[in-house]
Amino acid sequence: MRKVMSLAAFAVLMSASMALAAEVKMLNKGAEGLMVFQPALVKIEPGDTVKFVASDKSHNAESIKGMLPEGAAPFAGKMNEDVVVTFDKAGVYGVKCMPHYAMGMVALIVVGKPDNLDAAKAAPQSGKAKPAARQTTT
């Protein structure tokens, strides 16, 4: 009986540690306009997991070069598929939808204390992503 209880307690702890901290929708139209991540700004703690949901077609979620903490692994989801990412390192992570990046479809994940905020702000952006990225990092 003790063994069963120990296994049950372990299962509960593991499922709690893998719980989602946030869910971000990839949308053609949202509260902030066309081609958006909603929400566009998420604040979490190291080790938390975010699910990027392909609510509408023709979207993906991938990291933006130059907008990752040092030593963090880049990620790139496939088109029209949900992406689940665990953010282990503290800092600012820029996220883009590759097909709609120039239209400003960007999001920001702030994990713990953002030591790389200045570097993230200085990262080159293109098209409408430039003001959108600036807005999310202020």
Name every feature range the model reports, one short phrase each.
Residues L20-T138:
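Extracytoplasmic copper-binding redox domains, predominantly the cupredoxin/blue-copper superfamily
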Residues M1-L7:
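Bacterial N-terminal signal peptides that target proteins for export
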Residues A8-A16:
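Bacterial N-terminal signal peptides
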